[in-house]
């Protein structure tokens, strides 16, 4: 069975682009449009990986990541945070929240993703 990914992204355009990349490397993807929906989905059906946008309505990606990392169901699920920002401050906040990796959206590509997924043990 293909590894499962929960993508938490509020932009439908971005979600489609990212989903296409993830599916192109053989992953099964479900999409949540905001933080509360993403948390609910992750707790009900823990995925193999969570790809999480930082800028979300109602609660930001850092808050979502912290909640997921505190829950028994998802504490060991790798989280890759996505953002338009590339500053050190944002990276440190994301890692402190529990993210396993941090990828700027402008370099989100299949090759980089494959490398990260192998490092996290999601793909062989």
Feature-to-residue mapping (PLM):
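Conserved acidic carboxylate
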Residues: 9
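Alpha4 helix (beta4-alpha4-beta5 surface) of REC/receiver domains from two-component response regulators
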Residues: 16-19, 63, 86-107, 111-115, ...
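As written
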Residues: 25, 47, 61, 70, ...
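Acidic catalytic/metal-coordinating carboxylates
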Residues: 34-37, 60-66
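The feature encodes the CheY-like receiver
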Residues: 57, 66, 75, 87
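Residue-level signal for the "D+5" position in two-component response regulator receiver
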Residues: 31, 56-59, 88, 96
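Active-site beta3 strand of CheY-like receiver
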Residues: 45-51, 56
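Two-component/phosphorelay signaling modules centered on CheY-like receiver
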Residues: 12-30
């Amino acid at each position: 069975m293909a590894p499962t990914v929960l993508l938490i992204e509020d932009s439908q355009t971005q979600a489609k682009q990212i989903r296409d990349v993830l599916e192109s490397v053989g992953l099964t993807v479900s999409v949540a449009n905001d933080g509360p929906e993403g948390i609910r989905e992750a707790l009900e059906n823990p995925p193999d990986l969570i790809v999480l946008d930082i800028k979300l309505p109602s609660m930001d990606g850092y808050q979502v990541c912290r909640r997921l990392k505190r829950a028994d169901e998802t504490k060991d699920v790798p989280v890759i945070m996505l953002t338009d920002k590339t500053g050190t401050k944002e990276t440190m906040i994301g890692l402190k929240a529990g993210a396993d990796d941090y990828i700027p959206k402008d370099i989100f590509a299949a090759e980089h993703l494959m490398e990260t997924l192998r490092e996290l043990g999601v793909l062989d």
